[in-house]
Amino acid sequence: MDVLGENEALQQFFEAQGASGTLENPALDTSLLEEFLGNDFDLGALQRQLPDTPPYSASDPRSPPQVKGACCRTPRPPAGRIPAAFLHSTTAPGPLPEHPSQSMAGQTHSSFQNGYPESSHPATCRHQTGPSRLGTSCSFHQQPLCHVPGSSLPPTKKRKHSQIQEDSWDCSSWAHYFRPMTTRSQSIEVQDHDREGRNGMPVDQCSPALKWQPYQSVPWHSLLNSRYEKLPEVGYQVVTDKGFTFSPVDEAFVCQKKNHFQITVHIQVWGSPKFVKTQVGLKPIEKFYLKAFGIKVEATNQVIAIEQSQADRSKKTFDPVKIDLLTDQVTKVTLGRLHFSETTANNMRKKGKPNPDQRYFMLVVGLYAANQDQFYLLAAHISERIIVRASNPGQFENDSDALWQRGQVPESIVCHGRVGINTDTPDEALVVCGNMKVMGTVMHPSDSRVKENIQEVDTNEQLRRIAQMRIVQYDYKPEFASAMGINTAHQTGMIAQEVQEILPRAVREVGDVTGGNGETLENFLMVDKDQIFMENVGAVKQLCKLTNNLEERIEELEIWNKKLARLKRLSSSWKSSISEASSISKLSRAVSASSARRTGSKKPTKVSFSGRKQSCPNWVFQTLVVVLIAVMAFCALTIVALYILSLKDQDRRSPNLPLSNMTSSPEPALSSTAPTSAPHTTPETTQTSLQVPEITFCEILPCQETYCCPVWGPRILFSSPAQRQLEAEREIHQRQWAEDKSKSFLTSSALISPDWESDWIDTTIASIQIVEIQQMIDRRYCSRMLHCGPGHYNYNIPVNKNTPTNVKFSLEINTTEPLIVFQCKYTLGNICFRSQRERTQSDGEDAQMTQGYQHIWRLPVARFSDSAYHFRVAAPDLADCSTDPFFAGIFFTDYFFYFYRRCN
């Protein structure tokens, strides 16, 4: 029929729709229809732009037929570009396109809102009542959509379309089948939208979504650009929006034939495709089409046609849909109101159970490139198996009697199969996604009659493995915790990958697990904590063995300690034994002389014979005594000589203190002792004081004022009670140490035997420093008047007169072995604060201690004119402040520090 004018065209259009009289509606904007009729269009384009939901359906929203990037409007194709084989009938009415101004304003016209509701703006997955909506909202958590900035749909007053989510697409999902091509900025965008999408409903609270996988019935064709360069494979993903429900009994998705279903296809093209590579060469691309059809599982060559509901509730064969693919963008195409043209075979149940001869369909959605009515497959996806029934699928879900039965024991229920709680894919007899409370005990079979190959394990290896395991604190990801029903996200445990390297049999792969954001974790790992528990039992047994060995060794050490004490007592009685031996020899001489006289007076006839007979034993005895005394004297001289040589050798030997700060100048001759009987001694000389560096804070603090020095003259040595008490204590220790040292040579060979050398502990200090100024205390501070060598070290440390009284002194003592440092005694001299009493002496013997390699002591040096401290560095459990000084240099080493302000 010829169209003479726009008014006649409008009249015929509305008569075909059965909407005569709507032109009289004052709310109708005819400019939109006039613009539409004024342009060229074809019926195929109208058919492609049909609404997704017929006007009579109030429960299903309409979605746009095609979304580029983020639900953009589909541009009108030029006329005459769709093959005749795919054109719809001319009687099929087409929808009117949206006016640009109307889309921007977000307004609707009353005459069209009942027939063709506008597409809503993007909405997130919301929890809604009704089983159909529940499954739909779940699928979009599993297959999110990538948002393209700058594109959005206008808001509307209609019900929001929950199947469109431009702000939650995960671009990384393409990488499962295709090479990733997203840029850096796109990746950041995806993460932001993923976090927004996690606020939705957990996956396990929804029905499972229909899964898709690549399908290649024929080889896929490659795309080339204008320079004949091969482009990467097309990113292609199919998402099921609605229309399918999962039947646990049938273990398949079920679709009702009279109810329509809807799918959404996401397409990503990299570059600008211009040619398609075929078997006969390169062909220019004219159009891109989407085609959907079904196939039978048992016979994949048999195609099942797909139908689409029209606006007048009639069904027509679904023809390929022409689409426009933009360069380097995600194109979203929604195919709605689809039906299978026939049902599957053998749908009826047998005695309430699924039919063993049940037949299935599979849905295929492919992307084609067209050239002169020839179609070339670019990508295709195929769904899981589907059951298509003519009646409501809910009528078939009466499966409680088939799964659960009463047991033989009273009040018991039996399930012959796998049970899943909060999960629809149980792979064990019972799988619980969430917390579980067990008030009783969990029993395991352990009867020896059902075991074989019983072998004793190596507890040493179990201890080694347990020592390698790392215990960590962690938080489950929110989407995973919500999907698996984990209420307490923060937990303490192990990492399965780390345990797998140490104890592989304690880790199991349970297959693929889908998280709350749709991310699939391949070969998910779980830990068998029972195996780790048994490893702990073996490790504890090994620790018990080690503890017993240590106890035995401690007992042996105690025995050696008793032997050492006995040797000490023997050495103390050695001198008395020597004197007794000399007296016995003298007594024997006198006795022999008197006996000779008596025998001579009684028997004069045998004087010569008996005299020779008695004189020989006396001479031999006297000779032996003289030789013995000479040998003992020689031994004593040898011991004294060795002792003197050892003392000289020890003086020449430097202690284990750092000598990095020592200069080439001779050792300072700091006089730290003087006779206590002299009331006053001469002050220190200037030369001596300059050779020892002072403890000064002038590098970090201003040195302008003098603290804690008398105004009437220079400081006199040893006028402080701290110095006098320290010197008295030092002299006592020196005398005891010297006496014990002379005795120790008798037992030194027993103490330092090859058996003890391996366990000998070095109790000397590796380094000493003032922490605040990093000042090392070394041999330069050693006292010249007192012993400063193995066993006892005496240090005289001058403090600069400009040192404030409120600075902190931290003495750091470093050892090469883990030792214990005791502060056995301290003595404080004159206090520097003028507001308090001028002279205060305080001392203490409350022993304090530190352990380890590094020992830091806070000392009140700056607040006093002088102070003295006695530290004892001892081996653990072998010495303390009350240990006999005899063991100095063996079990402990004494250190005396005397700090004084140098005021001259």
From Swiss-Prot:
The UniProt transmembrane annotation reads 624-644
Task: Enumerate composition-biased segments (Polar residues).
Answer: 100-117
One Pfam family here: NDT80_PhoG
Q: Which residues bind DNA?
A: 108-400
Read off the InterPro entries from this record.
MRF-like, MYRF_C2, MYRF_ICA, NDT80_DNA-bd_dom, NDT80_DNA-bd_dom_sf, p53-like_TF_DNA-bd_sf, S74_ICA
Q: Which UniProt keywords apply?
A: Coiled coil, DNA-binding, Membrane, Transmembrane, Transmembrane helix
Q: Which residues form the signal peptide?
A: none
The alphabetized list of GO BP terms reads: protein autoprocessing
Instruction: Offer an example of a GO molecular function term for this protein.
Output: DNA-binding transcription factor activity
> Could you identify this protein by its name?
Myelin regulatory factor-like protein
- What does UniProt list as this organism's lineage? Eukaryota, Metazoa, Chordata, Craniata, Vertebrata
